[in-house]
Amino acid sequence: MAEVVGYYGTGRRKTAVARVYLRPGEGKVKVNGKEYESLNDYFKNPAWTKHAIEPLEVTNTLGKFDLVIRVNGGGLSGQSGAVRLGIARALLQYDQNLRPVLKKYKMLTRDPREVERKKYGLKKARRAPQFSKR
């Protein structure tokens, strides 16, 4: 049995985790075991789709790979960021020469921003209860 050539990358953003497999192909997309025409059918919002496939666009590899993505946790926005980082890391496995391009567009950097925890005595992380003088 022939070994299937594939490239793997993991991405995280907020509480979302994406495991991305790139396989040489013609641009098919499979997210969480379900086939999609494009990533836009999964993310719905074109901005999130554009954000997720940006690494493929800047490296001119759009349509050269089939995407198999397992993503869970967070909302669609966080998942989009996680998929983006996963694709970028998988592209590095495919070709190390893409590193300067991906680095230039800051696609290899994990966004460290997380939700700040709620503190007791406050309504939210920083929102204090309304103050009344009388």
Curated annotation (Swiss-Prot):
Transmembrane segments: none
Top-level taxon in the UniProt lineage: Bacteria
GO CC entries: cytosolic small ribosomal subunit
GO molecular function annotation: RNA binding; structural constituent of ribosome
Keywords: Ribonucleoprotein, Ribosomal protein
GO biological process: translation
Pfam families recorded: Ribosomal_S9
InterPro entries: Ribosomal_Su5_D2-typ_SF, Ribosomal_uS9, Ribosomal_uS9_bac/plastid, Ribosomal_uS9_CS, Ribsml_uS5_D2-typ_fold_subgr
Regions of compositional bias (Basic residues) in chain numbering: 120-134
Disordered as annotated region, ranges: 113-134
Family per similarity comment: Belongs to the universal ribosomal protein uS9 family.
Protein name in UniProt: Small ribosomal subunit protein uS9
